Amino acid sequence: MGGTVNRLVQQGHDVHVAYETSGNIAVGDEEVTRFMHFINGFNQLFADESDQVIKRKYEEIKTFLANKKQGDSDTRDILTIKGLIRRGEARTACTYNHIPLDHVHFLDLPFYESGKIEKLPMSEMDVNIVRKLISDVKPHQIYVAGDLADPHGTHRKCTDAVLAAIDMEKEAGAEWLKDCRVWMYRGAWAEWEIENIEMCVPMSPEELRAKRNSILKHQSQMESAPFLGDDERLFWQRAEDRNRATASLYDKLGLACYEAMEAFVEYKP
């Protein structure tokens, strides 16, 4: 939904972006090595190697990764670094789309922090974290991932946490919900069936290119990403192909012809 985010910003809306999970297990070890080389080099160049914490951690992590075997779990330090890499990429993408950094929220939901592909069960703690954010922001629109085809189930749990938080706010009689609509989009694995689509946001060639540029800010999720799935296309290629296919379907139905379209289904709590 990168095109929709860009459109909302251009129209002057107060846009907030919430990253529900750290995304740390979806970062390859070579990304950690690259960033550790950088920070160690920075320490050598500008601090005369005076930061002993950096030196010690650099050696610890380098040794661990050199001896890591397939199936070994990452240490908490490495998972933290991988999460930090994802945060940096997210901030870069948001800055590219003119979203202020104080409108970028990293929730780090606990269910994700198992350090493994299989996540922990979603708990009340996860829901309360999401609830606090939405009750503070009081949005007029909420966009959530309806990616039920996600092979790892993370998107489903993230969406469930948001919907559970909305239900709790509704039960509490939150007035802001009366002016709020919830839209579900799909990501890398599937698109909504055309008969179920309730809103489409068209994109020009320039807007589609801007969406691609935003995706490319997430460098750790390109060629070497651990969980690309069976589809050999990169995430930006999948997104463009799917958005163009949606626009083509509407063109064949006799509607206006656009370069691409993002599709949404409304969730009614």
Each language-model region and where it sits:
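Short conserved active-site loop signatures built around small residues
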Residues: 1
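Metal-dependent de-N-acetylase/amidase catalytic core
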Residues: 4-20, 24-61, 67-269
